[in-house]
């Protein structure tokens, strides 16, 4: 990957609540949950189903777009005669018929190849299929482990921005902010704003997206969507659409949705938005297991948030960011609950008490 067009994080707008807190105001900040801003090299898992064929071996170096496996669209279970396998056969081995007179499916068909699954009564069960599809790796890295029927584990090259959930298939593309620069944290993806000019890109949406927009984005050739929150209804609709797409005869390119925070609608965190803005125009990958945005941009300088910068991750003020102003002790909140709280300055307003359990900081 190249670093052309990548802006350093230092050029991004200041974060909300960026004035530096005094040393005395930072007391108790260690009680706030710390969220790592970036992760080191990840180990990404690409699952394999029975019958899938791995095309790489442990130790292989790969680049983005490499076909690492073949997936069987319609795998079937075939029982082999005892004479069809050698005495040293093991579960996970690839099996191929000796010739045109080889084993055939019970419903008819040609000679079979597949993966040996298990042995029962002196006969081996074979997972076989007729329509293999390539599984492409969206990132560069080194193959660490290959386990038939389980998965391929790859150590990714570069850094990663973790999410909480990713739906769809691993993919990669050019990162696009997807909306006006000043509105990227709270932007909304509307289906009417999508066109074929966005083909091959991964869009940063902000806080709001609906299932119709996701379906249209995929049809327009968009490779992925980055959103802060995805509600339950949109999630169910997208998964149903994915199921129909997997069953289609001609599948579209891989498409993924990565959720950065959860189901509640809220803006993208300021420190995270600063990184995404710095990556605009660069090639990034979305992985499913673990859910993350992976990029290999050594020239991207990631600025640390100011001391005392905190974000409200849940509760009435979810999504707001400000400056830690010290411990507030036990306070009474909605519902008559008493919780340990801290003072937080939000939008240059007087400090308010927020439950410590509702806060997070970045490191």
What name fits each language-model region?
Residues 1-363:
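Well-ordered secondary-structure scaffolds
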């Amino acid at each position: 990957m190249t670093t052309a067009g990548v802006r350093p994080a230092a050029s991004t707008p200041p974060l909300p609540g960026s004035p530096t807190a005094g040393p005395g105001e930072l007391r108790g900040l260690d009680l706030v949950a710390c969220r790592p801003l970036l992760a080191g090299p990840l180990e990404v898992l690409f699952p394999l189903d029975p019958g899938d064929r791995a095309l790489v071996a442990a130790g292989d170096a790969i680049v983005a777009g490499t076909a690492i496996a073949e997936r069987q669209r319609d795998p079937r279970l075939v029982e082999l005669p005892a004479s069809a396998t050698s005495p040293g056969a093991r579960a996970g081995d690839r099996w191929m018929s000796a010739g045109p007179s080889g084993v055939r499916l019970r419903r008819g068909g040609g000679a079979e190849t597949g993966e040996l699954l298990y042995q029962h009564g002196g006969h081996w069960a074979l997972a076989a299929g007729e329509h293999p599809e390539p599984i492409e790796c969206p990132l560069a890295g080194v193959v660490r482990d290959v386990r038939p029927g389980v998965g391929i584990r790859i150590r990714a090259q570069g850094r990663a921005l973790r999410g909480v959930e990713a739906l769809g298939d691993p993919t990669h593309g050019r990162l696009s902010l997807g909306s006006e620069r000043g509105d990227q944290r709270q932007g909304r993806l509307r289906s009417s704003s999508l066109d074929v000019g966005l083909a091959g890109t991964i869009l940063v949406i902000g806080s709001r997206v609906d299932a119709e927009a996701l379906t249209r984005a995929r049809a327009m050739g968009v490779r992925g969507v980055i959103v802060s929150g995805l509600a339950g209804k949109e999630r169910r609709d997208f998964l149903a659409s994915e199921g129909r797409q997997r069953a289609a005869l001609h599948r579209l390119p891989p498409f993924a949705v990565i959720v950065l925070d959860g189901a509640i609608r809220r803006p993208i965190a300021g420190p995270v938005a600063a990184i995404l803005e710095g990556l605009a125009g660069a090639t990034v990958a979305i992985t499913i297991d673990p859910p993350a945005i992976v990029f290999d941009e050594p020239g991207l300088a990631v600025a640390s948030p100011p001391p005392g910068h905190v974000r409200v991750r849940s509760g009435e003020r979810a999504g707001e960011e400000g400056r830690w102003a010290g411990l507030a002790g036990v306070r009474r909140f909605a519902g008559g609950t008493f919780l340990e709280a801290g003072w937080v300055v939000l939008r240059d307003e007087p400090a308010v008490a927020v439950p410590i359990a509702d806060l997070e900081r970045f490191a």
